[in-house]
């Protein structure tokens, strides 16, 4: 089976993480869409493993958590009338927990917006931290049980509850209602009110929408398969944490957090992809039967 050179595959992965759609990459790089999809699936699986292995023992002071909306195949409100909609069509939520100082994505989760998803995120977050932290979230009620279950009393936790004005008219439904104020609510421990904020994680939500085409609103670049959506988030997370230079830090978030000493590259990821998928070993050729002439 033919395989693209490593440099070509690395460029495809980079373009996926810089906001290009799969079909746009296929056109610009003169490859098939299936080739781009296979590169995403192979690398995404490895990136998820690398995140689990490398983002451990994180020493953070302040963690901010939030969830960002996207959809698979069609939006939730149109699932009932959509043609040939798969069983997992509808809204998808990506949960993230970010170190406010190093900007490291400590934990992420692709799922729904249920209490169970919040529990899984917080359990994962707790397993990667080495010390007591201050956690800030929005007012989503699912966080209350999740933080309590994962951290017990060993956490300083507060919620930032935003107060909004009237909802925009249907014509302006993509314009959010005006935020008229915020309320900081202490939930557990002794959180420092000065650092009770979700500003960094909300800013990162915009970064995610800019870097992953399937998160961009009002386009047809949305996900068509939940599995590929999860692979893209895993690919982006490793890219953001270990490969991409953060514009303010002048290094990667992983380096700032002290869990990496140098930059990684997609060549490193592809080396693991190739190691996990070695080429088939051909058997010996021959012997052949002697050809009998007419």
Predicted regions and their residues:
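Residue-level recognition of single "structural anchor" positions
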Residues: 1-294
């Amino acid at each position: 089976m033919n395989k693209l050179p490593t440099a070509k595959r690395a460029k495809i992965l980079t373009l996926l993480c810089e906001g290009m759609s799969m079909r746009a990459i296929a056109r610009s790089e003169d490859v098939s869409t299936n080739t781009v999809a296979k590169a995403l699936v192979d690398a995404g699986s490895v990136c998820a493993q690398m995140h689990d292995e490398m983002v451990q023992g994180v020493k953070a002071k302040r963690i901010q958590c939030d969830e960002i909306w996207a959809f698979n195949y069609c939006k939730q409100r149109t699932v009932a009338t959509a043609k040939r909609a798969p069983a997992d069509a509808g809204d998808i939520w990506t949960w993230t927990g970010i170190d406010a100082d190093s900007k490291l994505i400590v934990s992420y989760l692709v799922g729904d917006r249920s209490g169970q998803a919040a529990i899984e995120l917080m359990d994962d977050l707790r397993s990667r931290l080495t010390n007591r932290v201050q956690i800030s979230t929005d007012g989503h009620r699912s966080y209350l049980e999740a933080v309590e279950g994962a951290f017990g009393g060993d956490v300083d936790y507060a919620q930032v509850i935003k107060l909004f004005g009237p909802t925009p008219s249907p014509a302006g439904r993509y314009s959010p209602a005006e935020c008229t104020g915020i309320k900081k609510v202490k939930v557990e421990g002794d959180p420092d009110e000065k650092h009770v904020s979700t500003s960094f994680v909300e800013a990162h939500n915009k970064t995610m929408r800019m870097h992953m085409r399937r998160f961009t609103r009002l386009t047809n670049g949305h996900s068509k398969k939940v599995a590929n959506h999860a692979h893209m988030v895993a690919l982006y997370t490793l890219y953001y944490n270990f490969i991409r230079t953060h514009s303010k830090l002048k290094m990667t978030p992983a380096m700032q957090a002290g869990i990496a000493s140098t930059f990684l590259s997609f060549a490193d990821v592809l080396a693991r992809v190739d190691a996990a998928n070695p080429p088939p070993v051909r058997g010996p050729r021959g012997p052949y039967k002697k050809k009998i002439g007419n």
